[in-house]
């Protein structure tokens, strides 16, 4: 018994794990205090806990058994740096980086293995198009390469979805050109062939390059790429804005751009062309010279003719017209909408409607212009993408799904405030500047609102836009457009010789007398009459406006009344005779619903001017913004060439003043710094006279619309030698681009 007792005492585990009957056998009376079934359940439960802990935490046999409360606590821990909670919280970025590294490492290995397994694949990539193209169908440009013993490639200056543009030197013509290299793919080739056809058609009707369209010199196929050779141009208008730190250019310079663009759109609207550009934006309007205001429109890759519309998704979003957004039929008016957006952006420095998508774009348009008319939305296939129709038949703008973007109520973001009409311009930056009065801004706002008419049928047309008072100059205004006399494709001057008392009119196939040149690009031309008076423009004076029914060309080309003869001298030894219509009363304008009465005569002889060889005092009040690509004036000390004033007692006409007083040749021979636009020192963009006897000098000049003549509307304004000198000083200070420096960066012409 003693031995058994020792054995029992030495094995506490047997006592702990023994069932109740073993305690009875040992003489211990513990089982009587609890029921037999309860004891069995308790022992079974304890055994399960022990088994679970033993399997979860393997203990060393030599380790002492923990207390019951300690059995639930882990004895070993994972490295905190590898804990999932830490990886997905504090080290989340590191985790993602590691995932990316592993993913791309595997991808790179698979790519290398694939190339190793199929050596022909790598060889095929190398010799695509006999090694001349990359895998994106673009020609591999090599600087210094010579093409066809004619073109020496200088550098790549542009790239786009169409292909690439390179700067090259033409050794035959001895000039720099821009070559647009189309991708070696059928779809791009087909579209480029349309562009070539349209460019050739436009150049055919603009042989003197007067209408601000880029000149396509020639085209050819080279190594399976269609190549278009263009004249070399300078910066685009977006580059110009960027170099003003997006503060915008002056209203004077904006006016110059506006008139040239309207002239170009008038040219595109001629019946023989009827071309829609479809992608007007600052990037597609290029300066001809970094120190001049002359511009040209480029990139007709998306263009089409009126009867051959191909695409529905056209125009860059910021400049997309309502009819394109709404899916209704479009015509040439979409380019006028784009122009309105561009002009505001050029002056404010910021896009007028900068939508992130089409819904946002329409919402931003509605903020400024209000809800489109119901008759437009009722016919629009995509109206319900942007608007919802109320039970009473009106339309409201749809609320955004996320509700994050908040828009101002329709029509409450006024253009009046955007332009800063009464606050000194955008941001008050133009306060006190000459040419930025409230009256100037009211004219600008009015013409922009006419360009941004929702209804394409009543949206102002180029012909009428050119006659808006924004382009006119009054007796007290010296900063409006300059003395360009240039012709529109629809209304040309015919040649004539003799004195100012002789007038000849060319009907171009139609009979009758000429009454007006109102389709010409300078509708600001003021005319002398016997009393020495000239017409003055009031703030909202717009003699002809958008008609209710859209017309390609102005109504009434001929009238029975005899024209008034006016002489305007454009050179000390020359003068030009124009046909001026009799005075007419201004027709009051009701926006989008005006009625207009005008008489015009269509001249078909392009590029011909009526010149006579007599010296006369020159007329001062004739503003026009046309800037020739070849003819500009410097500000100097001598009075000669185009700015000279000849004193003549035989004429009582007032004189048209240029802002510089040295001839065009002097400007051409003057070295031009490549990185500056200081017009106060090197010339001015304010005024350019562009009627010459030498047809060669007319290259790059716009057309010249004449204004209606109205007697006794203002005092005569005569310019003396002293006044001209003072005028030159004013122009030096008010030069539209004085102080604007643009870093040299050649821009492709298309």
From Swiss-Prot:
Q: Which keywords belong to this entry? A: ATP-binding, Kinase, Nucleotide-binding, Nucleus, Phosphoprotein, Serine/threonine-protein kinase, Transcription, Transcription regulation, Transferase, Tyrosine-protein kinase
Record: residues binding ATP: 157-165, 180, 230-233
The catalysed reaction is: L-seryl-[protein] + ATP = O-phospho-L-seryl-[protein] + ADP + H(+); L-threonyl-[protein] + ATP = O-phospho-L-threonyl-[protein] + ADP + H(+); L-tyrosyl-[protein] + ATP = O-phospho-L-tyrosyl-[protein] + ADP + H(+); [DNA-directed RNA polymerase] + ATP = phospho-[DNA-directed RNA polymerase] + ADP + H(+)
User: What start and end residues bound the annotated signal peptide?
Assistant: none
Q: Which Pfam families match?
A: Pkinase (PF00069)
Where are stretches of biased composition, namely Polar residues? 477-493, 610-621, 741-750
Q: How is it modified after translation?
A: Autophosphorylated on tyrosine residues.
GO BP terms: namely: peptidyl-tyrosine phosphorylation; positive regulation of DNA-templated transcription; positive regulation of RNA splicing; protein autophosphorylation; protein phosphorylation
Per the record, which residues fall in region Disordered? Answer: 56-81, 104-129, 400-434, 477-531, 583-666, 731-750
Residues covered by the Protein kinase domain = 151-471
Q: Where is this motif: Bipartite nuclear localization signal?
A: 109-126
**SUPFAM superfamilies of this UniProt entry?**
Protein kinase-like (PK-like)
Which residue stretches belong to region Histidine-rich domain (HRD)?
A: 584-612
Query: Active site at which residues?
Result: 279 (proton acceptor)
For bias type Basic residues, the affected ranges are: 587-608
Compositional bias (Low complexity) spans? 494-517, 622-659
Identify which top EC class this enzyme belongs to.
Answer: transferase
Cell inner membrane among the record's keywords? Answer: no
Family according to the record? Belongs to the protein kinase superfamily. CMGC Ser/Thr protein kinase family. MNB/DYRK subfamily.
Q: Do you know which PANTHER family this protein is assigned to?
A: DUAL SPECIFICITY PROTEIN KINASE, DUAL SPECIFICITY TYROSINE-PHOSPHORYLATION-REGULATED KINASE 1A
> What is this protein's function?
Dual-specificity kinase which possesses both serine/threonine and tyrosine kinase activities. Plays an important role in double-strand breaks (DSBs) repair following DNA damage. Mechanistically, phosphorylates RNF169 and increases its ability to block accumulation of TP53BP1 at the DSB sites thereby promoting homologous recombination repair (HRR).
The protein here is known as Dual specificity tyrosine-phosphorylation-regulated kinase 1A
Whose protein is this, by species? Xenopus laevis
Q: Provide the gene name from the record.
A: dyrk1a
């Amino acid at each position: 018994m003693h031995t058994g007792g020792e054995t029992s005492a030495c094995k506490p585990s047997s006592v702990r794990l023994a069932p109740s009957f073993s305690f009875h056998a040992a003489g211990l009376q513990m089982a009587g205090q609890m029921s037999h079934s309860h004891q069995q359940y308790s022992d079974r439960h304890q055994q399960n806990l022990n088994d679970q802990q033993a399997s979860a935490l393997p203990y060393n046999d030599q380790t002492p058994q923990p207390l019951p409360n300690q059995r639930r606590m882990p004895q070993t821990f994972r490295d905190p740096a590898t804990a999932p909670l830490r990886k997905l919280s504090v080290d989340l970025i590191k985790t993602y980086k590691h995932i990316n590294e592993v993913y791309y490492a595997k991808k790179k290995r698979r790519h290398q293995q694939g190339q190793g397994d199929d050596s022909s694949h790598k060889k095929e990539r190398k010799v695509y198009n006999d090694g001349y193209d990359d895998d994106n169908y673009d020609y591999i440009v090599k600087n210094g390469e010579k093409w066809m013993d004619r073109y020496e490639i200088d550098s790549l200056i542009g790239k786009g979805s169409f292909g690439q543009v390179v700067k090259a030197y033409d050794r035959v013509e001895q000039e720099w050109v821009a070559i647009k290299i189309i991708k070696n793919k059928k779809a791009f080739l087909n579209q480029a062939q349309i562009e070539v056809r349209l460019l050739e058609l436009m150049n055919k009707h603009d042989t003197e390059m007067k209408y601000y369209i880029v000149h396509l010199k020639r085209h050819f196929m080279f190594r399976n790429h269609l190549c278009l050779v263009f004249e070399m141009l300078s910066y685009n208008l977006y580059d110009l804005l960027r170099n003003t730190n997006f503060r915008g250019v002056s209203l004077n310079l904006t006016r110059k751009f506006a008139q040239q663009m309207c002239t170009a759109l008038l040219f595109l609207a001629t019946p023989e062309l009827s071309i829609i550009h479809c992608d007007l934006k600052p990037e597609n309007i290029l300066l001809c010279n970094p120190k001049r205001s002359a511009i040209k429109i480029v990139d007709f890759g998306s263009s089409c003719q009126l009867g051959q519309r191909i695409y529905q998704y056209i125009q860059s979003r910021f400049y997309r017209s309502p009819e394109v957004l709404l899916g209704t039929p479009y015509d040439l008016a979409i380019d006028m909408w784009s122009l309105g957006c561009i002009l505001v952006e050029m002056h404010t420095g910021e896009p007028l409607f900068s939508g992130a998508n089409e819904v946002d774009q329409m919402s931003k348009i509605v903020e400024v212009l209000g809800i489109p008319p119901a008759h437009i939305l009722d016919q629009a296939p995509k109206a319900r993408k942007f608007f919802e129709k109320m039970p009473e038949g009106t339309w409201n703008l749809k609320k955004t799904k996320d509700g994050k973007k908040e828009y101002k109520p329709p029509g409450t973001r006024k253009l009046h405030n955007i332009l800063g009409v009464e606050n000194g311009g955008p941001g008050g930056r133009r306060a006190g500047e000459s040419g930025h009065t409230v009256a100037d801004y009211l004219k600008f706002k009015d013409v922009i609102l006419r360009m941004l008419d929702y209804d394409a049928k009543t949206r102002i047309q180029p012909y009428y836009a050119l006659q808006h008072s924004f382009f006119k100059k009054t007796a007290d205004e010296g900063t409006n457009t300059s003395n360009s006399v240039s012709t529109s494709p629809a209304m040309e001057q015919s040649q004539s010789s003799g004195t100012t008392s002789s007038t000849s009119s060319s009907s171009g196939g139609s009979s009758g007398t000429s009454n007006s040149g109102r389709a010409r690009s300078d509708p600001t031309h003021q005319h002398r009459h016997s009393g020495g008076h000239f017409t003055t423009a009031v703030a909202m004076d717009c003699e002809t406006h958008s008609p209710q029914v859209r017309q390609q060309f102005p109504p009434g080309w001929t009238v029975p009344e005899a024209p008034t003869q006016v002489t305007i001298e454009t050179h000390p030894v020359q003068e030009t005779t124009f046909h001026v219509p009799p005075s007419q009363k201004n027709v009051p304008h009701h926006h989008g619903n005006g009625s207009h009465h005008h008489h015009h005569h269509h001249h078909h002889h392009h590029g011909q001017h009526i010149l006579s060889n007599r010296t006369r005092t020159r007329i001062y009040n004739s503003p026009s913004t046309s800037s020739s690509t070849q003819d500009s004036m410097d500000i100097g000390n001598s009075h000669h060439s185009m700015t000279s004033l000849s004193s003549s007692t035989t004429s009582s006409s007032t004189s048209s003043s240029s802002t510089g007083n040295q001839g065009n040749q002097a400007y051409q021979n003057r070295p031009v710094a490549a990185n500056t636009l200081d017009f106060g020192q090197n010339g001015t963009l304010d005024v350019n006279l562009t009627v010459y006897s030498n047809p060669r000098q007319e290259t790059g000049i716009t057309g010249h619309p004449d204004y209606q003549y109205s007697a006794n509307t203002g005092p005569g304004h005569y310019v003396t030698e002293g006044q001209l000198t003072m005028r030159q000083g004013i122009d030096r200070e008010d030069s539209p681009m004085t102080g604007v420096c643009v870093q040299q960066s050649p821009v492709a012409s298309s």
